């Protein structure tokens, strides 16, 4: 009886602790470079999207813990040209801000025009056409004060500031260098905040890998000079206490103050699996901030970031629910994305089926016919019925980069598993099939992807397993994470649930 009471007490205490805290990441899967703003009781957050279309996902939350994607900022080809963009190019590090009834999103389209901003009166859109900006560098940010608008970015390995006209994009003042950081490489991702008479300048340093970290400086004048925080870095897991944690690469953050006066930091990090490999990409995390009057901000009590964060002011974290696909809709939802700008006539929704018209290989950078979703969960599965016509190839791709993907596909009466890794391109296994429609299934955990097929949806046969680590950023490369989706090449392919 005593053992039962002790066990019951342990369970109650454990559940109570979880209810008072939350688990990171708050937005799992490839959602890097978060920026956030609060409007009344509502929080809005955006992320980088690189080569994918539509660009810059927009999330909404009432509590900083539970987030829902409500759309994408860049939904038109005229806003987001991505022709030939690899996973190293495209949309870098957006910033979202709200001022006087208008939402602003400023970002960089690397390889296709540089820095620009768009505006909207509703964060769900529609957003304006791009207003192009002359100040160079990446990771631009906006700061509004007394009718003036300032833009900061990082040309030349330093943070520079200028005043701009947000209606025309015209630069109204000469660019002024503010800070070169605290000695780490790649000072980037700048954001300016004003508090207690100081202008605080938050930046990332160290590059977006293992040594990524956040530093901060402040000044009484927006143009400087800026003094470094003696306690820099204010966020890092590349430390004695944090180096052995699963979460690494903490950096690129944005402060936000909740309605109750508390301060919080959203930032990117990644989770290592099977050693020092991450394949899900850089994800969005949250940490509490103590920011006393006139003092420097302290993130998470000065401790490294772990999966469970204790924060009694936040509500219960809800578990996300998987939503079934509806092929009767012409829009599968804002979370579904294409590699580069899609050719619209290659995607036809009809009679609860999706017809994909093949256009180029997944290994090329030429608008392949592909529609997928970021892999957000460590464990799960994806399954579709596939019917290629004539000599077409179609199936499911576990896609990290054009030089790194696993493809389970049907072609010419065979079902095959292909592994594409840089210069390696081979068929792991191929079986003869007789059914026109074939069920394809990809299931996964933290170590392996398993590839199976069935002609009746009940009895499945395995074609093999492939390691998650080979699609990691450390091996395959790129700035993104795994996206799992449907594709077609060389002809028409039908998909059904």
Regions found by a protein language model. Name each.
Residues 19-497:
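Carbohydrate-active catalytic/glycan-binding domains of CAZyme proteins
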Residues 4-13:
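Sec-dependent N-terminal signal peptides
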